[in-house]
Amino acid sequence: MSAARTLRVPGRHGYAAEFSPYLPGRLACAAAQHYGIAGCGTLIILDQNQSGLQIFRSFDWSDGLFDVTWSEDNEHVLVTCSGDGSLQLWDTAKATGPLQVYKEHTQEVYSVDWSQTRGEQLVVSGSWDQTVKVWDPTVGNSLCTFRGHESVIYSTIWSPHIPGCFASASGDQTLRIWDVKTAGVRIVIPAHQTEILSCDWCKYNENLVVTGAVDCSLRGWDLRNVRQPVFELLGHTYAIRRVKFSPFHASVLASCSYDFTVRFWNFSKPDPLLETVEHHTEFTCGLDLSLQSPTEVADCSWDETIKIYDPVCLTVPG
């Protein structure tokens, strides 16, 4: 692996990282003081250049920030979510506070995602109050609230293929698929026998969703037949915090964990573990794969660092 470009952010513990879909080399990171247990949060916007990683702008919030998503409509706009139950809409072109704050959830909001399909600009949020909400960012209140999960919601993510469809993962051990048009749940999958902390949609198969859980396993689900997973990936030694499918390779995905590692997998291979990256000294919570470069990965950790790097398995053919 090439040497990671590293930015140290003293006193801030990283929870989520996401590459800009517009600007090559721009990354957003949601972070919190005191491991998110108390204190404030910071949204860090950084750029990479020949000299490394540099902070372009940072925004503080009065509570920990747990997730971040870029607008699919405006290269300067993004949304974060917080421990105080609110979402914040930011404009990186302005060095001021949020343009708008959306406050309806009654407990921590752990997940936020901006829709990727053309023709709709919607944000989905998942909370410890056991609800999912869908928002039009131009409107101050949510469009609809989805109930059904029986524990905290850790992950909510739009389908990149099907308009108005999103997945959610929860401490109630289920993966659920929802439809905004019917304002209801389409599929309930008892995906693990432990809390599920993350899920993601395959970019090349509209029926494939992956889950990552406290049981250290990743499982792939074909939504046409959910009786058993189509693959299971084992190797992490502590809970899997986040999982992301590759935007460039149909069967490649990455996961990060409380075991401090990031692992890369190809679920179509007999030996699916491609590479294990061990460059953090604390829980690794944030992870993203670049939409612009097939080899570039970003992560962030509770060790107060953000890293961008090119794992060997993505730089060599096969």
From Swiss-Prot:
Protein keywords: Cytoplasm, Peroxisome, Protein transport, Repeat, Transport, WD repeat
Protein name listed in UniProt: Peroxisomal targeting signal 2 receptor
Pfam families the UniProt entry points to: WD40
Family: Belongs to the WD repeat peroxin-7 family.
Primary location class: cytoplasm
Any one GO biological process: protein import into peroxisome matrix
WD repeats: 60-100, 104-145, 148-188, 191-231, 235-275, 279-317
Originating organism: Cricetulus griseus
Assembly with partners or alone: Interacts with PEX5; interaction only takes place when PEX7 is associated with cargo proteins. Interacts with VWA8.
